[in-house]
Amino acid sequence: MSSEQAAAMGRVAVLMGGDSAEREISLISGRAVFEALRRRGVDAEAVDTAQVALAELTGFDRAFIALHGRGGEDGVIQGALEALGVPYTGSGVLGCAIGMDKWRTKLLWRGAELPVPPGALLRPETNRQALIGSVGLPLMIKPAHEGSSIGMAKVERPEELEAARAEAARYDDLVLAERWIEGGEYTVAILGEEALPAIRLETPRGFYDFEAKYRSGDTRYHCPAGLTEAEEQQIRQLALDAFRVAGASGWGRVDFMRDRQGRFWLLEINTIPGMTDHSLVPMAARAVGIDFDELCWRILLDSRRREAGRP
């Protein structure tokens, strides 16, 4: 990459922080991206959106969005940037809004006949016995609009259900209950039109929760994931299909479970995944020879789509 290419990106705002429940992770991601772009010669500036008025972003030529959670990953900041005429990285308004809503994402995936675990919305008035009868136990209870596994819990007995629902409801009015898939956890990163190598996650914590993602030293990551060539091709294609059906674009991540019979099940999509030293997209990129600085540069380059009027 030449200095002329870096200069052509103009003044770049690396958006981070914000005021969501994932603020601290976003600050770490954003700082890492900012430093990578600066090393590449990009005129980047770190911008905490909780401390800067949106109108001030008109002074930038483009934005690298490293915000996680509400206000950053749900289409809100994307819509604001479009109104301001500032090109940005990643998915557009629609893709982000859908991707942030686990319930509606799964409705779309089911409509496209993609493999999704059985599930239902869990409300205070929901008939618990009917839910368990139709979906089964164990269950995974989760807020419909939070990331980083915030508010999630595994329920193995009927008497645990209400406490798990109440905890998830602290973060969201919509609470999702879906069948727990016993098996291996996998994730596939998307970069442009390409699915990167799958990663298999191994944690002693029962599932890949917030602690396992960001704090635990016990989580193990396997890339290559130990799949056959056909299985690797299958999970990558499934990730691309799920990403496109949800209206996502640019870059992101799709999470899976693989059951004991070898079937892959879609869990959720991440339109702005973490970019910390524990993060999965940089790990998958390294597996194909793309270092962190190059990864950030490629994601930034993708913002040119919006200058051409493409979603």
From Swiss-Prot:
It comes from the Bacteria. One of its GO terms (biological process) is peptidoglycan biosynthetic process. ATP binds at residues 132-187. It is found in: Cytoplasm. Residues 106-301 form the ATP-grasp domain. Pathway: Cell wall biogenesis; peptidoglycan biosynthesis. Mg(2+) 1 binds at residues 255, 268. It catalyses: 2 D-alanine + ATP = D-alanyl-D-alanine + ADP + phosphate + H(+). PANTHER family: D-ALANINE--D-ALANINE LIGASE, D-ALANINE--D-ALANINE LIGASE B. This is D-alanine--D-alanine ligase. It comes from Alkalilimnicola ehrlichii (strain ATCC BAA-1101 / DSM 17681 / MLHE-1). The gene is ddl.
